[in-house]
Amino acid sequence: MEDGQPYRALTSQEARLASWLLAHGNPDALGYVGQLERAQVTAWKCPCGCASINFKVEDRPEAPPGVHTLADFQFVHEGNLCGVFIYSSDGILSGMEVWGISGDAPPVLPEPENLSPLESTEL
């Protein structure tokens, strides 16, 4: 990140989307709102070029490998069906992932108003 820093603050769009996902996710998702308020984005970048991000929560260790989905929604980007989910690992808020369902994973995060509940991904 800037000046060699390994973490940066969430952008307003990232924070808004993550907050919305936690508010509309699984029953345990709301329990992660406090962690989101202390989260930063790591320097990790997905090699595919998508907009996925990883979190580092202040006063918590790095989240171990693993995915516990807290919220999972779908949206359309440039005519392709895509998905976005926020997840934790071992009780630590870990990241937000975008993925392609009917095409490539999008290089941008969706706006919450464009999300709908994830339907079956079978084509």
Q: What are these regions, as identified by a protein language model?
A:
Residues 1-72, 108-123:
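N-terminal domain-onset segments
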Residues 75-123:
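Short, compact, well-ordered microdomains
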